[in-house]
């Protein structure tokens, strides 16, 4: 029985090490290649209360990834800009600004803007909107840029 427990512990440690290595490589790459990083200010601890999402969220280590981005940004003199979780990043057309409230459901992965006709992948569209919002937050109060 002890051999099996040791084997399972070894597998868990290997998975943890691989995940940490991956998170370090990705976070370092992002920080080195970008002067600012806009991220959605998700409350991971609240999301873990949803039992349907908890395992998936904890397995990808979102909060750990975010911590890595923040401390590496300080090391490299870069900025991490949190964007409010209430900002409708997935719902806004990144081309014209139209708000599609039907995109609230996570089942809808792709959508076409009825105003300008742009085709959107939910995640790519959200990332473009988060970038624009982060730029606005960074430049707020700067004459002529906000």
Q: Where is each model-derived feature located?
A:
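Positively charged, helix-rich recognition surfaces that bind polyanionic ligands
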Residues: 1-146
């Amino acid at each position: 029985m002890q051999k099996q427990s040791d084997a399972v512990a070894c597998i868990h440690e290997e998975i943890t090490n691989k995940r940490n290595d991956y998170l370090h490589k990705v976070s370092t790459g992002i920080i080195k290649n970008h002067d600012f990083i806009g991220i959605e200010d998700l409350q991971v601890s609240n999301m873990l209360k949803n039992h349907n999402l908890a395992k998936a969220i904890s397995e990808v280590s979102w909060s750990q990834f975010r911590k890595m981005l923040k401390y590496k940004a300080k090391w490299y003199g870069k900025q991490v800009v949190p964007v409010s979780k209430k900002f409708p990043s997935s719902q806004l057309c990144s081309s014209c600004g139209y708000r599609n409230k039907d995109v609230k459901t996570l089942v809808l992965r792709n959508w076409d803007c009825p105003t300008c006709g742009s085709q959107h992948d939910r995640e790519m569209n959200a990332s473009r909107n988060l970038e624009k919002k982060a730029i606005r937050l960074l430049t707020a109060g700067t004459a002529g840029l906000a």
